[in-house]
Structure formats: structure tokens, C-alpha cells
Amino acid sequence: MENNKEIIHESEVKELIIELRGEKVLIDRDVAKLYGVETKRINEAVKNNRDKFPNGYMFSLQVSEKQQLVENFDRFSSLKHSPVEPKAFTEKGLYMLATILRSPRATATTFAIIESFFKLSLIHIS
């Protein structure tokens, strides 16, 4: 996904969605990967727009949650000894993030994220 013009498919998003605290979320590093930016850019966007991310939009992982990620998902192994507290974005938080990140890649990624969460909600309802 290094090419900023690459189209993001719903299947790519779906396989990154995890459940924490009873909510389907994407972890900041996965969000960054989808948007084709560094994780620190996602976190800077949040920090610079804190008022757009109230409770329920995103949260920092507790140590035990971070440990759970490392143990259950190979893609998070680099977090094992990292002092960084990863952030989890809920569906609402991802929509808000989309209003901040502006680029053709961000627009395409947002469409894929919206479709993925919508389809997951349909599965949950059935």
C-alpha cells in the first residue's frame, strides 16, 4: 500500500477491524497504513483537533489491552516493548478523522472504511 493512488478494498479494512471494549475499532497504526501515512501523522491530526474526538470516538489502549493485541495479532509485535499507547478509533472516530485528512487517498480509504463497517453492522443484525 505504498502507492498513494492504490485503491483500498473493503476486505483489507475488514481484516484489520478488531473488537475492544465491546466496540469494533481500528488501531492507529492500521488506520495510518490504510491512509498511506505514518502513525504519528494520524496522532498529530487527533492532537491538533482534540475537540473533534470526544469520548466514544477514540481511546488510548490500557497496558493490558496493548498486551492482548501483541499476544493475539502478529502485526502488533513491534508494540511489545514500545512505550507508546496505541489509540483505537471507533466507527464515529474514523468518520471524524476523514473530515481532517484530505487527499484522494483519504477519500478512497474513507469509502472503504464506511462500506466495511456498514457491512459488518448488517451481519450483526442478521
List where the protein language model places each region.
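An anion-engaging/catalytic patch
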Residues: 1-117
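Conserved small/polar residues in nucleotide/adenosyl-binding loops
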Residues: 123-125
